Design a protein with these regions (language model features):
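Bacterial N-terminal signal peptides that target proteins for export
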Residues: 1-12
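Extra-cytoplasmic beta-strand recognition segments
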Residues: 58, 107-147, 197-200, 244-245
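Secreted extracellular polysaccharide-interacting domains
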Residues: 92-117, 121, 173-183
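Extracellular carbohydrate-recognition regions
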Residues: 27-72, 256-257
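Extracellular beta-strand ligand-recognition surfaces/modules
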Residues: 58, 124, 141-143, 190-236
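Extracellular glycan-recognition surfaces and repeat-rich motifs
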Residues: 58-94
């Protein structure tokens, strides 16, 4: 919790407060691209179901899952090549040539939801194939973003929790409106489905002081990405599959490790 204490102390200093808010309150990382308006449509929770995600296994195609920043990266695919259950999964296909570099490049799978209460648990499965690391900061993660949260301070436009799943062992960059919680620090295992889960409500309570209430929407992103790639180092490649994604009460979690 010392990071939170230091952060709040800095925000009390007027000059630093303006700087911090200016560089670190984008929906993704400081200096990153801004999502095109209308790309993702917030969803009401499915009626009569514990899972807040619509189409969690991609058996009904891609919607209402969406992709952000299509000017930077291609959209996700619905694949029948590999699936944890059923016949389909979501595929993020990273293909970045060796000569390309940059601060960050993110391949996304996103759903936005508007539940009345903040959910308890996220779980699911990922699978990695063809992992070629083009920079030390190449990794998988999922991100939970709560927008317009009146009960959390400081008063950022959004409050985030970020969950690296594999590929990095240290925080990849500084961001004022997010905390990192590592679910894995090793290189990703390839050729097998890997289960993950996290009580996101407890994490918001621990790191932000309370679970979000009164928010306008939640955005959940499942990613493969890199940060700080130097041109000419190596190609950054991966095929990352996500399937059987769940967000809701822990007691109703349909997934098992």
């Amino acid at each position: 919790m010392w990071r939170k204490t230091v952060r709040l102390g800095l925000l009390a200093i007027a000059g630093l407060a303006l700087f911090t808010l200016a560089v670190a309150c984008d929906e993704e990382e400081a200096g990153g691209p801004t999502a095109a308006p209308g790309v993702c449509v917030p969803q009401m929770p499915p009626e009569g179901q514990a899972n807040l995600f619509h189409n969690p296994g991609f058996e009904a195609g891609g919607g209402p899952w969406c992709s952000l920043h299509l000017e930077e990266t291609p959209p996700f695919e619905v694949s029948q090549e590999l699936a944890h259950s059923g016949e389909s999964s979501a595929l993020l296909r990273m293909r970045v040539p060796a000569e390309e570099g940059g601060k960050a490049k993110v391949f996304y799978l996103v759903q936005e939801v508007t539940p009345e209460q903040f959910p308890e648990l996220i779980s699911g499965y990922y699978r990695v194939e063809n992992w070629t690391k083009g920079t030390p900061k190449q990794y998988l993660q999922f991100v939970v973003i709560a927008f317009d949260v009146p009960n959390l301070t400081p008063a950022y436009p959004n409050h985030q929790m970020r969950y690296p799943l594999a590929g990095i062992s240290e925080e990849p960059f500084n961001i004022a409106n997010a905390f990192f919680v590592f679910l894995g620090k090793e290189e990703p295992r390839t050729g097998e489905w890997v289960y993950f889960e996290r009580n996101i409500k407890e994490d918001f309570q621990q790191f932000w002081g309370a679970a979000p209430a009164g928010f306008s929407k939640l955005r959940v992103l499942f990613e493969v990405r890199y940060d700080d790639k130097e041109p000419g180092t190596a190609a950054a490649e991966a095929d990352v599959y996500y399937d059987d994604l769940y967000m809701g009460p822990a007691s109703a979690n349909p997934n098992q490790p």
